[in-house]
Amino acid sequence: MLKNKTFKVTWNYISQTTFMYGSKVSFSNGEVTFINPLMPSGLPIHEWLMLKQFSKYKSAPSLPILRRGQHYKLHFDFDATPAGSVYFIIIFYNKNGTKLSTEIVKSNSITIQYPDEAYAYKIKMMNAASTSLIFRCLTITEMTHQYDLEYKSMRVTKIGDDQYGNDMINVIIAEPSDTYPTISNDFLKLFGHVWLVERWMDDNIEGNIKQLKNDLQSQDTLKAINLISYGSKSNVFATYVAQHLGCKVYRTSHEDDDLKGWLTEHVPGNHELKDTNVEVYFKEEQDKHLNYMSRLMNPVRFLDYLDVSKLNGGEVNET
């Protein structure tokens, strides 16, 4: 399989599109630090352009030329304080400079199709009450294969957002599997306000950890977050995310040593993790099928051992 073409876009200097009123901007080791706690929300911090008039901007275009009708995956590598306080806008223009369409990106990644009528585009990095920002790069990857066009990035299904005053959330980390069906919505409703996180191993695990962490931290009304897992890989992932968030994790005793070692080696900040409140609701020695047959059975069955009433403050959602 041919490797997809990837363009790396960086922020190399202060330009006319950089918001500089009261801002402190520094460039070091491939990172840009932007600090301005007084910057109004809704204004662009910086812009990247595909077309520029050199006489006006005194610099070359910073975005690659994209092919019409082609699919691309864009990934934004950055950290904002507070979490969720920076987002991106992709604006497409036709030949006469009229705005054609707009994409608003509030996560780290998005897959787009470059419009057939588009002549140019630009990307704005927007402020939403951010006090500081560390920006590393933007990557634009051309999706050239059918597998890529059906790209399976991390998926978060949200159910029952209005349950329990919206101040408590149960986040179920699905065990990766191409064999077993996904957890049904009817089963998920037992957990009240619940997010189901799937396909977190299909792409950039480090990026998925960061995205999930940011998404949860942006839920300002939450008083409690419970992470729930039920398999060897999901247990490792859930425990790691819970350590970043300082929240409670409910898991089984199963653990994938290879994944645990990989996270320790490849994901930054492993040595700075917070203590996690871990409750093991099922231990491996309890498994009546503890033999080669156990590996053939859907591990979601272990969730039957979890006392759901503990998760929702003593309540069980029976609707």
UniProtKB/Swiss-Prot annotation:
Alphabetical keyword list: Protein transport, Translocation, Transport
InterPro entries: Acessory_Sec_prot_Asp3 (IPR022259)
Pfam families xrefs: Sec-ASP3 (PF15432)
Highest taxon above the source species: Bacteria
One GO term of the biological process aspect: protein transport
Gene disruption: observed consequences: No effect on cell growth, significantly reduces export of the cell wall protein SraP. The small amount that is exported seems to be glycosylated normally.
NCBIfam families named among the record's database cross-references: acc_sec_asp3 (TIGR03711)
Subunit record text: Part of the accessory SecA2/SecY2 protein translocation apparatus required to export cell wall protein SraP.
Purpose of the protein: Part of the accessory SecA2/SecY2 system specifically required to export SraP, a serine-rich repeat cell wall protein encoded upstream in the same operon.
Family the UniProt entry places it in: Belongs to the accessory Sec system protein Asp3 family.
The protein's name in its UniProt record: Accessory Sec system protein Asp3
Organism annotation: Staphylococcus aureus (strain NCTC 8325 / PS 47)
Gene: asp3
